[in-house]
Amino acid sequence: FKFDVKATESDRLEIGSGDLSRVADFDIDDNDWSVYRGNNDHSASTKVAVAEQISKIWEFVPGRQFSPTTATAAGGLIFLGGDDGKVRALDAATGTMVWTYLTGGPVTQPPTLWNGRAYIGSGDGYIYALEAATGRLLWRFRAAPVERRIMVYGSLCSTWPVNSGVLVEDGVVYAAAGIIDYDGTYLYALDAVTGEILWQNNSSGHLDKELRKGVSAQGILASAGGRLWMPGGNVISPAVYDIKTGEYLGKGAGNGSPDMNANRGEEIGIFRDKFIILGGRLRYSASENVVKPGRFDGHSIGSGKDFGHA
C-alpha cells in the first residue's frame, strides 16, 4: 500500500450544485459560538453575559435516537453532528428542524461555521462544506487515501475517518484523517471556498518508515502561534505542525514503543499562547473507561516539558 500517496483535486474533490463563491446570507459575529469550544484555541470562554435565571422554551426530540456532538450556533441556527452520520440545523428560537444532511459515516465533532458555510469531518473519510443556511452541498474532499470501510466500535467507517473536527482560519480549512499511525495519518489545508489543496502532510504517521510509527489522529485540531496542534496518540502527543506549510515540527518516533503513561485524551486547548492543555477521554472509549481513566496534562509551548497533570 502506498501510504504517502499525493492527493489531487481531480481524484479527491467533488463539487456540489450552484456557485461556490455565493452562499445564502448568514450572519456570524463575535458573540456567536461558531466553532467547538468557541474559538480555534478552544478557550471555551465568551464575553456574552448569561442570565442568572433561565427557563426551558423548547425541547428537541429526535425521531430516532443518536449520540449527538456538542453544538455550535450562529445566524439563528444551532448545529449538531451525530453518530448516525447526520448533520442537523435547528431554529434557535423554536427548536424546529431547518435542514439535515447525511454523510457516509459517524460525525464526532460539531460543524465549524465560517462566512455562511458549515464544515464537517465525517467517519466516511470526507471533509464537507455546506451552505449554512440551507444545507446545500458546496464541496466535499476525500481526506482518506482510498475508499475503504472497516467496523470501528460498531459503526462502518473509513480506515481513515476525519475525527479531528474542521478548523478554519484566514480562509483555510484544516483537518486530519486517520485512526492509528500504523495505517497512516493525513493532514490537509484546503481553500475554504473552493476546496482546493493548499498543502498536505501524508508522512507524519510514519516518522519511522520501517516501523510505521509516528503521529496518530486522536483528537480535535487547535491553532496558536502559527502552529497546528493535535492529540497524537500514545507515541507522540501533542503533535505540532507549521500552519503555513504543513511541516511536522515535533519530536521523532523514537523506538516506536507506546508510552504507557502517554495522555491519549482527545481534547486540546491553548492558554495565553504559552501552554498546551491536553487530555480528557480517549478518542475511542466508553463513558466509564476503567482501563485508562482520562486526565489533563499541561505542556509549555517551546520547551516540551510537562508542568503537571490532573
Name every feature range the model reports, one short phrase each.
Residues W33, R64-V87, Y101-Y128, S155-Y188, ...:
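Repeat-blade elements of multi-bladed beta-propeller folds
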Residues F1-T72, L77, K86, T96-T103, ...:
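Aromatic (tryptophan-biased) beta-strands that constitute blades/sheets of beta-rich domains
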Residues D91, E131, D191, D242, ...:
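Structural recognition of the beta-propeller blade-terminating site
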Residues E52, D83, A93, W114, ...:
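Short, ordered coil/turn segments that flank beta-strands lining enzyme active or ligand-binding pockets
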